[in-house]
């Protein structure tokens, strides 16, 4: 009805308790309203609205409404920066093998250290695919990474990006699926489930942080009535079927992917240098103020013709917690980590405290000599089960009693490893009472939207310290973080899994990469009872090649 008719009807309906609020809301809106919106404002149900329609007061019509999870989000538009010489070399190779005329699909392993600018290569590849009227699929290992990834991609390609992940409602996922099928979006971002988005013109698949175990769906996640798959294997097959380029990127490639590259099944693209982040208008005062990370100037150039600034990866201090114990320090924080944390917060900077644990699995270690209880038959670390009060071998299922003394040195100082984030948070408040702490683990992100909320709180500097598990090691760009503390590096090292050394190296390297991503520099403190382990030593040196060679030898020796 017209505004005049609505006003007249509103006056006539003044005596009706049922009609008046609805007419008032419609009159105030001065436009058609969705039933759900009107119901939220007035409590109107469909029966009441149909009665009003029968009385000639309102009109009703059905209209398809697609729910877009990014609707209402505003992303700052960005333009492509000039590439560094290293990025240019990688991009020239990628373009020649994947996007030039006459080229079919190709598969690449992009091995670049944390902060080397891999995302810009992804963006260039997407731009090339779009120029060929093709579409792109971008896989990330966790929903937690989606907000930052979407912001980068939507800023470069406004209106062409959408997301698919399990935090969307069933209706939202259905609507996004239909919109993608209709060709409304050219770029889909999401975790492994996004692989099944109906992209009819797929030309590029990107797997960011390809080493992450979350790309493989495990039986314990969904029960026995689910198809289990490895997203990397599915993506490889999908790329072959659709003749799409496949880019698998990581600072710490999986052993399988790096071995496949050596066998000639993937083309290697390397970016061994970290580009100083947030550099578009980097003040020279900030470059000179870099604290613990030395800053080098290269002859490469940015848009504004300023020299490219490279930053070395943050130095890593390994703290032997056995020595801390002998010195009388029985807390979960070493003296070095406590001092660094206090200095960081005093300088107005941020810190990440990382716990390398998976679920509630724990093991038993001697705090004097560092010996770990192992199965005498399998040489596999035994897992402590609190309810059963037993040590269980997850390889042969044999059970053993809990030792009262260390079988190696006779010490009675036996510790059960597996401290949680809550305990770490409590200790932070003991040494820095005024610290604002956020926790990022499976418990703290149980509700929809919690990933983005926690990340936003930390990025906006409404928190000083982030305490978390594996989630915080995955590709986040946090420029104010200058300190990363690994509370117990050994926890993941002695899980009953042949990949435990690989995953420990990957996690330590990745979480160390969260520090020093701006001109402020950074430092990393790794606490461990086994500082001599090759995975910890290689991670401290940011040396993937050394770790790969040693781990490959270990696997060959053990079949």
Language model feature labels by segment:
Residues 1-140, 443:
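Pre-Walker A segment
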Residues 78-84, 88, 92, 103-559:
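Inter-lobe coupling/hinge segments of SF2-like helicase ATPases
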């Amino acid at each position: 009805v017209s505004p005049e008719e609505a006003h007249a009807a509103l006056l006539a309906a003044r005596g009706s308790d049922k009609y008046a609020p609805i007419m008032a809301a419609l009159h105030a809106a001065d436009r058609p309203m969705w039933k759900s919106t009107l119901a939220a404002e007035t409590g109107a149900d469909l029966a009441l609205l149909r009665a009003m329609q029968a009385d000639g007061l309102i009109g009703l019509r059905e209209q398809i409404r697609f729910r877009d999870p990014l609707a209402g989000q505003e992303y700052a538009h960005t333009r492509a920066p000039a590439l560094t010489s290293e990025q240019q070399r990688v991009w020239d190779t990628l373009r020649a093998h994947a996007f030039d005329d006459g080229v079919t699909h190709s598969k690449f392993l992009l091995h670049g250290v944390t902060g080397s600018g891999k995302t810009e290569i992804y963006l260039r590849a997407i731009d090339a695919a779009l120029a060929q009227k093709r579409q792109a699929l971008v896989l990330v290992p966790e929903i937690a990474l989606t907000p930052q990834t979407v912001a980068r991609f939507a800023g470069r390609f406004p209106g062409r990006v959408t997301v698919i992940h399990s935090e969307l409602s069933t209706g939202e996922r259905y609507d996004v699926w239909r919109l993608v099928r209709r060709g409304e979006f050219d770029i889909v971002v999401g975790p492994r489930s996004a692989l099944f988005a109906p992209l009819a013109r797929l030309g590029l698949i990107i797997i960011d942080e390809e080493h992450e175990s979350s790309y493989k769906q495990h039986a314990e996640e969904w029960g026995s009535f689910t198809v289990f798959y490895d997203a990397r294997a599915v993506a490889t097959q999908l790329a072959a079927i659709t003749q799409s380029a496949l880019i698998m990127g990581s600072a710490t490639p999986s052993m399988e992917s790096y071995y496949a590259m050596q066998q000639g099944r993937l083309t290697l693209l390397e970016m061994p240098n970290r580009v100083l982040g947030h550099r578009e208008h980097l003040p020279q005062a900030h470059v000179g103020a870099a604290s613990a990370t030395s800053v080098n100037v290269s002859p490469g150039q940015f848009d504004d013709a300023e020299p490219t600034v490279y930053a070395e990866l943050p130095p890593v201090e390994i703290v032997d917690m056995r020595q801390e114990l002998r010195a009388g320090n029985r807390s979960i924080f070493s003296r070095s980590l406590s001092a660094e944390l206090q200095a960081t917060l005093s300088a107005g900077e941020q810190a990440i405290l990382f716990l390398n644990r998976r679920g509630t699995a724990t093991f038993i270690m001697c705090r004097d000599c560092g010996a770990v209880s192992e199965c005498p038959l399998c040489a596999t670390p035994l897992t402590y089960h609190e309810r059963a009060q037993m040590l269980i071998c997850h390889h042969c299922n044999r059970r053993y009693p809990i030792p009262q003394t260390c079988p190696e040195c006779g010490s009675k100082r036996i510790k059960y490893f597996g401290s949680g984030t809550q305990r770490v948070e409590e200790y932070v408040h003991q040494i820095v009472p005024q610290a604002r702490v956020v926790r990022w683990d499976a418990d703290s992100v149980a509700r929809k939207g919690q990933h983005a909320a926690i990340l936003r709180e930390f990025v906006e500097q409404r928190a000083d310290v982030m305490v978390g598990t594996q989630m915080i090691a995955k590709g986040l760009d946090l420029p104010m973080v200058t300190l990363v503390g690994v509370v117990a590096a050994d926890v993941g090292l002695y899980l009953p899994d042949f990949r435990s050394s690989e995953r420990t190296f990957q996690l330590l390297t990745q979480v160390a990469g969260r520090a020093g991503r701006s001109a402020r520099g950074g430092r990393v403190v790794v606490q461990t009872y086994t500082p001599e382990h090759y995975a910890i030593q290689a991670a401290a040196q940011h040396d993937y090649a050394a770790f790969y060679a040693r781990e490959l030898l270990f696997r060959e020796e053990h079949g």
